[in-house]
Amino acid sequence: MNFVEELTWRGMVHTMMPGTEELLAKEQVTAYLGIDPTADSLHIGHLCGVMMLRHFQRCGHKPLALVGGATGMIGDPSGKSQERNLLTEETLRHNVACIKKQLAKFLDFESDAPNKAELVNNYDWMKDFTFLDFAREVGKHITVNYMMAKDSVQKRLNGEARDGLSFTEFTYQLLQGYDFLHLYETKGCKLQMGGSDQWGNITTGAELIRRTNGGEVFALTCPLITKADGGKFGKTESGNIWLDPRYTSPYKFYQFWLNVSDEDAARYIKIFTSLSQEEVEALTAEHAEAPHLRVLQKRLAKEVTVMVHSEEDYNAAVEASGILFGNATSEALKKLDEDTLLAVFEGVPQFEVSRDALAEGVKAVDLFVDNAAVFASKGEMRKLVQGGGVSLNKEKLSAFDQVITTADLLDEKYLLVQRGKKNYYLVIAK
């Protein structure tokens, strides 16, 4: 498999230094990609870079995932409009450990293969590097004129914020450049990959290597992922879509991919899955014949959810989706854990009732009219129940004066009332 050809048909090549493809064709190459450890989880904005490393390893080359323990303590100005908060060493070590665990789902760190993946942390070689060492070994090789010409620097200096660029952030490109030099000298690393906003930092590293020891190295960047409507990829109203289920439940993760537009699904299925070109072309053709069936979105959501979480989490997410949008049973509803239940019914009207009252038993008509205003009046509720239009926990309410107790609670806390086909209400016992 040819790595550059693989990335090209997937739409994952933005800029490539001349000679990169020739280098990859003649030898097993070691390449690295930097990951910012400012959180203890990756989010889907990291996924394109991680998939580059995955394809790189599958093509027989050796991937290095560099977590910027040192550079993360400073913050990269590329694409940023303001200074970043600095992280403590303890926080960074925790974040790095969590990120490695997530990367292990995409990369082979364990085998004896010569191209097994490695995780490196630039804090390990920067922590004892004094400022005088840095000035002598790195600073003297790159001119301020060269550094000032970078887009990331110019954008901050001329930006609307008018708060300039700190010396700390200005030197970031030299620190990242030194990473490339260090990995070139210690690991034989000849290629750096990253997002297109990293091109300036990557070429600084290549220039540093050329000026210090005459070495020739290469660079390849992927496009920054966007949405067809111009919105920011990977962001929702509630923030990032994280890979860690503590921050984004597998159900919400699955729903994100399931709900992308047709245009985005056609691009994302190439970038975020390992499906072959033939499989993608077949799915795209099938989708074009019946777009309403959302074949691309369903397959995209399946592939990414299984890869990031598990087959079990994917199946649970599909089942949970059916509860809101299909004819699910009460058994399926009872199987949901609390986090998924709340994720599925996020945004539906919620009411609180007394747990003590439920312990003694309350007539449904009193509970859902007086205690929780699900219905406007007892007469309205009686009429709907008689017409079979009210369900409790996905089972038809048999009588409007049926007694409800704590035994009816889901997860010992919730009652799900359904009025008609589409109106849901969540009643919480407190």
Swiss-Prot record:
Record-listed ATP binding positions: 235
SUPFAM superfamilies given in the database record: Alpha-L RNA-binding motif, Nucleotidylyl transferase
Enzyme class name: ligase
Superkingdom assignment: Bacteria
Main location class: cytoplasm
Compartment annotation: Cytoplasm
All copies of domain S4 RNA-binding, residue ranges: 362-429
Family: Belongs to the class-I aminoacyl-tRNA synthetase family. TyrS type 1 subfamily.
Role, per record: Catalyzes the attachment of tyrosine to tRNA(Tyr) in a two-step reaction: tyrosine is first activated by ATP to form Tyr-AMP and then transferred to the acceptor end of tRNA(Tyr).
Protein's recorded name: Tyrosine--tRNA ligase
Source organism per UniProt: Phocaeicola vulgatus (strain ATCC 8482 / DSM 1447 / JCM 5826 / CCUG 4940 / NBRC 14291 / NCTC 11154)
Name of the encoding gene: tyrS
